[in-house]
């Protein structure tokens, strides 16, 4: 336990905040190339085949990122843009792929929340 004089002299050092998306290096998005596109199963109690891709970023990091929405056109060597944002039931998946940008197609039939899925406004 420090004395008052020790606290006056040195003070308390605030705990460093842990970065949840280190691969982005402070950027809002990063570009990368898919090295593997596959499905994986979520943690209990959920059950599904979640679509994910291993992406090598321009800064050399290799991360696993989630492919949101129904259906996708991604394969190996597709160029994608990733953003931060984890998937709660997939351990180790801390990034999302942006739809409708670079090689990733948007979702054609999407009516609501279109901006998240790169969908054009329906006529």
Swiss-Prot record:
The keyword Cell membrane is annotated on this UniProt entry: no
InterPro entries xref list: NA-bd_OB-fold (IPR012340), Ribosomal_uS12 (IPR006032), Ribosomal_uS12_bac (IPR005679)
Keywords per UniProt: Methylation, Ribonucleoprotein, Ribosomal protein, RNA-binding, rRNA-binding, tRNA-binding
GO annotation (BP), single: translation
Sites of 3-methylthioaspartic acid modification: 89
PROSITE patterns referenced in this protein's UniProt entry, alphabetically: RIBOSOMAL_S12 (PS00055)
Protein's UniProt keywords contain rRNA-binding: yes
A GO molecular-function annotation: structural constituent of ribosome
CDD domains attached to this UniProt entry: Ribosomal_S12
HAMAP family recorded: Ribosomal_uS12_B
Function: With S4 and S5 plays an important role in translational accuracy. Interacts with and stabilizes bases of the 16S rRNA that are involved in tRNA selection in the A site and with the mRNA backbone. Located at the interface of the 30S and 50S subunits, it traverses the body of the 30S subunit contacting proteins on the other side and probably holding the rRNA structure together. The combined cluster of proteins S8, S12 and S17 appears to hold together the shoulder and platform of the 30S subunit.
Subunit structure: Part of the 30S ribosomal subunit. Contacts proteins S8 and S17. May interact with IF1 in the 30S initiation complex.
PANTHER family: 30S RIBOSOMAL PROTEIN S12 FAMILY MEMBER
Protein name: Small ribosomal subunit protein uS12
Gene name of the encoded protein: rpsL
